Amino acid sequence: MLESRDLTKKFGSKVAVNRMTLRLEPGHVYGMLGPNGSGKTTWMKMAAGLMKPTEGEVWFDGEKVGLNSRARVAYMSTEPYFYAWMTPALAGKYYRDFFRDFSMERFEKQLESMQLDKNMKITAMSTGMAAKLKIAITMARDADVWMLDEPFNGIDLLARDAIRDSILSSMREDKILLLSSHLVEEMEAIADQAVFIRQGNLIETRDVKEMLEAGTTLADRYREIYAGMEGA
């Protein structure tokens, strides 16, 4: 279980995340939703142990997030993090040297399912191809928690189905998968739990299936929560 307790992050006078208490349980796919600037990335970086909170704590399986727990979390950022001269094959070897839980076999299967050439130079890749490579690298780790920040950015509509299948094929009952996005329709197709964040505050966590059975789509609820907000 991954849990934040009154987690807060301030940048000067700006409060990016405000006293967020959130619990993520194994066996679930969480979709963290909110417009750009709502605090999704900041919360994820703190939960992954990559950013120090101003206040509050993050706990993972009964201990505070630190070096031990950080090794069990695979976080995919929105920023590119490959050397331009690399190919996917070289990038895989590079990550294998850094992470003991990285599987080249799993990585190559991810590349195949996403139709990526492992010998293609990264400099020759489109934005969408580079985005797919980031997902493949992250999901090739046998982590306890996967966090994918805006995984569908830059990926065309036709490629998203294959990417969803590739991501979900890695899920198991003992894993936690968290994806952040402002693409609501994509989250409805992949997440079973929806986490709504507005201006750094946790609004609610909802069961997606129960919402749909009650006649409310994620898009409906998104509009209700974020109507009138700039960038929503």
Language model features with spans:
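Conserved ABC transporter NBD signature motif
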Residues: G56-S69
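Helix-to-loop junction immediately C-terminal to a conserved catalytic motif
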Residues: A48
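ABC-family P-loop ATPase nucleotide-binding domains
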Residues: T78-K134
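The feature captures the beta-strand-to-loop junction immediately N-terminal to the Walker
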Residues: L33-P35
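Helical segment within the ABC ATPase nucleotide-binding domain
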Residues: R160-E173
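Catalytic Walker B motif of ABC-type/P-loop ATPase nucleotide-binding domains
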Residues: W146-E150
